[in-house]
């Protein structure tokens, strides 16, 4: 038997203690199964009931804690609706405080979206009927209450909203919801030992140390061997994610925010600011387990060090471990080139009617040195027009617009290729970004659109502006 020095014994003891102390999901063998939000597939005339209420969830294993959600479930159901249908919404607020809701990315008038101007008081209902006219996309709904959107969204008032059309279902893409078409809602949180969400309303920005995906920490999912589609939403308040696979495998970026790209883009990494969505395809024909992560690959010792540290890093940066099973898929031996029909690149040749510049001061939560004033209109745009907006910020931050859509023209002076251009409503500002904004929906003084920081902590401090489109 080998002699063990006192120093080695101490190190071994500390390591063993650490292993017993860390959260179970840090150990791959104990990962929970990914929860898939319930699917509400609406058809013409079928109402969509969304009851905002208290409920319970297990954010930590074996600990039930009070959260918020819809229809008795933490987070909301995924709404799937077809283009040219009508969304017959029925919001009901069963919470003890008033709430305003936004459907981010939905192309409709200010009166139908509601947004910050439509506060639902306790026990109040609202039932707008919204025509769905836009191309296939992955949108999301969340609380947007003035000065309280971050807290309410953090508690669980959010969900996915998927739009399809006849053409998008014939493209050969994975489309079995929860099987090979997987929704991933990313949230970072701070919890106490009982699993209760911790939140400070007046802190500058919110960076939680634990990463949750559909309400689960570092989950896994057994999927069919073959091509898998991941729809990823950054629903965090402030944190930006750097998505990649832990084996550095290539994936195909096919869509972002408001629709498909002209053609699939081969990537190893993609950045995702708050409110941004991407759809990616990953080939799992090799049958090997692989994890989608944020940042760089870590070992168990790295995770343990982050668990005992306080550096703003996530304890575990695993988003989802994919465990493929079954026979190889149809794409095993041929390279698929994905082409999609989108009019987004045509905006590059459209006449620009006005140019504007917006600078976000992250430290002071201002846009062009101003905070939100409900009595002041910050942008008045003409219906049907196209404007060029130049966006900059004092430090990296997400930006979002409601009721309109845009394409990214250039990033830090470098123009995007036409094949990379798709419709968006949210973007990361890291330096200077030029976007072309198209206004196809009306808003009014009573129901204005908003634009500004997609970081809801900053938005609650007034880092947004009001927009009239007539």
From Swiss-Prot:
Subcellular localization, as worded in the UniProt entry: Periplasm
PTM comment text: Predicted to be exported by the Tat system. The position of the signal peptide cleavage has not been experimentally proven.
Keyword rRNA-binding: no
Membrane among keywords: no
Signal peptide: 1-29
Function as written in the Swiss-Prot or TrEMBL entry: Cell division protein that is required for growth during stress conditions. May be involved in protecting or stabilizing the divisomal assembly under conditions of stress.
One of the GO BP terms on file: FtsZ-dependent cytokinesis
UniProt record similarity statement: Belongs to the FtsP family.
InterPro entries: Cu-oxidase-like_N, Cu-oxidase_fam, Cupredoxin, FtsP, TAT_signal
Pfam families linked: Cu-oxidase_3
GO molecular function, one term: copper ion binding
Protein name: Cell division protein FtsP
Main location: periplasm
Gene Ontology annotations for the cellular component aspect, listed alphabetically: cell division site; outer membrane-bounded periplasmic space
UniProt keyword annotations, A-Z: Cell cycle, Cell division, Periplasm, Signal
Gene3D superfamilies xref list: Cupredoxins - blue copper proteins
């Amino acid at each position: 038997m080998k002699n063990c020095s006192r120093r080695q014994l101490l190190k071994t003891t500390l390591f063993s203690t650490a292993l017993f102390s860390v959260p179970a999901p840090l150990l791959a063998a104990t990962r929970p199964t990914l929860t898939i939000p319930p699917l509400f597939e609406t058809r013409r005339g079928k109402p969509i009931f969304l009851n905002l209420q208290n409920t319970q969830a297990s954010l930590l294993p074996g600990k039930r804690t009070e959260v918020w959600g819809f229809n008795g479930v933490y987070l909301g159901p995924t709404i799937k609706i077809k283009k040219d249908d009508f969304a017959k919404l029925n919001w009901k607020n069963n919470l003890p405080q008033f709430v305003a809701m936004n459907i981010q990315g939905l192309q409709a008038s200010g009166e139908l979206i509601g947004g910050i101007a439509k506060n639902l008081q306790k026990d109040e209902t609202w039932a707008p009927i919204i025509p769905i006219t836009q191309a296939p996309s992955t949108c999301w709904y969340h609380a947007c209450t003035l000065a309280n959107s971050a807290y309410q969204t953090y508690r669980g008032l959010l969900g996915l909203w998927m739009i399809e059309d006849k053409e998008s279902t014939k493209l050969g893409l994975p489309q079995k919801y929860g099987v090979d078409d997987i929704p991933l809602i990313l949230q970072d949180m701070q919890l106490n030992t009982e699993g209760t969400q911790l939140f400070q309303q007046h802190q500058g920005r919110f960076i939680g140390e634990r990463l949750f995906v559909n309400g689960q920490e570092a989950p896994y999912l057994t999927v069919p061997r073959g091509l898998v589609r991941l729809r990823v939403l950054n629903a965090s308040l402030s944190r930006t994610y750097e998505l990649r696979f832990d084996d550095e495998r290539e994936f195909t970026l096919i869509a972002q925010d408001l629709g498909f790209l002209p053609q699939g883009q081969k990537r190893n990494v993609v950045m995702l600011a708050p409110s941004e969505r991407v759809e990616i395809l990953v080939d799992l024909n090799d049958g090997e387990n692989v994890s989608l992560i944020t940042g760089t690959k870590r070992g168990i010792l790295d995770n343990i060090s982050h668990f005992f540290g306080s550096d703003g890093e996530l304890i575990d940066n695993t988003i989802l471990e994919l465990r493929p099973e079954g026979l190889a898929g149809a794409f095993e031996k041929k390279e698929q080139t994905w082409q999609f029909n989108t009019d987004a690149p045509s905006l590059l040749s459209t006449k620009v009617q006005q140019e504007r510049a917006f600078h976000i001061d992250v430290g002071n939560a201002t846009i062009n040195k101003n905070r939100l004033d409900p009595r002041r209109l910050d942008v008045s745009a003409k219906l049907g027009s196209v404007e060029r907006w130049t966006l900059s910020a004092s430090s990296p931050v997400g930006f979002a617009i409601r009721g309109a859509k845009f394409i990214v023209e250039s990033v830090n002076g470098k123009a995007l290729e036409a094949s990379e251009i798709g419709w968006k409503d949210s973007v990361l500002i890291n330096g200077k970004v030029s976007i072309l904004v198209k206004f196809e929906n009306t808003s009014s003084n009573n129901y204005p659109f908003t634009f500004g920081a997609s970081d809801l902590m900053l938005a609650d401090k007034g880092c947004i502006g009001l927009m009239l489109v007539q």
